[in-house]
């Protein structure tokens, strides 16, 4: 079975498990359960203000928004399938799957929990443009991306000891068949694009809180393995380390840790012709040669350490910051969580790690809260709307996918950057703001002709903002805006910049079963070779069951 087939099977099982768990709970234990399927029809017009070209299509969609919340099970899913029919010969028909699902179930209360999640979205996969933004339905650079994860988590106490353990299985599939079919342009750079991967993550720790001793301590270890289809790539990481936390006041503690880590990334050599040139498919894909020895793309093996502070001035605020040695150089990481009040929250982080696309996407998906905001942008039905952030219903929580979707490449890379989320609401107002900066340095085998990304660095910055206001019980307005900048770092390639703003209006009728909506948007793209300004308009009707 293909990875895409496995994704669909597991996504269906995820929803079935959540609903079955809800049905199995006694009525007194239920908090809330809601399943809201719908069908929808839209008429969309896109006008390129630079060329004067106008494209029109009709979209027919079916989807479901559902949530379950009990004492032991919490789950939520937002899924949408859309079929688009182009008017005229300039826009071909197409379809798309978009959605996100999360599940958390307490198998043994206060001891063993199972978590699972699934994602279906669309993102640019040619490595030369902004991550998210306005695109036509038949843009071959846009790929369908599917991912799924599941696993148990153990957290318990044995006497004075805290014992934790977890296992997580992850699956990622990128459907970029349209891009594969394009002929390779003369002089084009060969990019090793991602296809699919499976990964396994295992961790365990034992420790003691401050109290039994004047300091807290933890000893733990972990193992990670990812196997990708392209060129039989393999990423393997293992570590063991010990950490201590020493309070120096009621709100401040010092922390330090030391350990050992080994990371190795390898893959097949590439097939070459008699002249030593790489053999590629008509779409520019490299072909592996299993008869040759495997190539090492990245390796680190040695002692790691870091030290820092933990600051908790109140139950609403926590700041952690660390500096150390890892990956052969200095690392700096930090995190901040601050509840301004019950209505507004803020979170931020500075990150540094060696990653792969599959590993990073699964980590981002697992960071999405179970209770998330299911609102979508009407002119770009991507996960989380136009931008790459999904906000939790708890103010200041959520996850941004920009660091994963910066480039859908098959290589391992050093990933450094920062992100910030600010969200909340009061009365009829609700809003979310997210920003992310990410820099990647790629690692590929050092061979003559064949790998274009080795030791190259790309960068991206994304800013997203969205707000809604309820005008009445049956009417709502929304406003969304984004700005993306991306520099691929490839020789001869210029940086790309895109912006967009969308406004929408929603009106419900017939006991809230029928909803009419309209939206207007303006989108710009500038990548040096191609500039465009597109105005978009939409009217639609949705019927909920």
Segments and roles (model prediction):
Residues 24-26:
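N-terminal signal peptide c-region/cleavage motif recognized by signal peptidases
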Residues 2-14:
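Bacterial N-terminal signal peptides that target proteins for export
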Residues 28-545:
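Gram-negative and organellar
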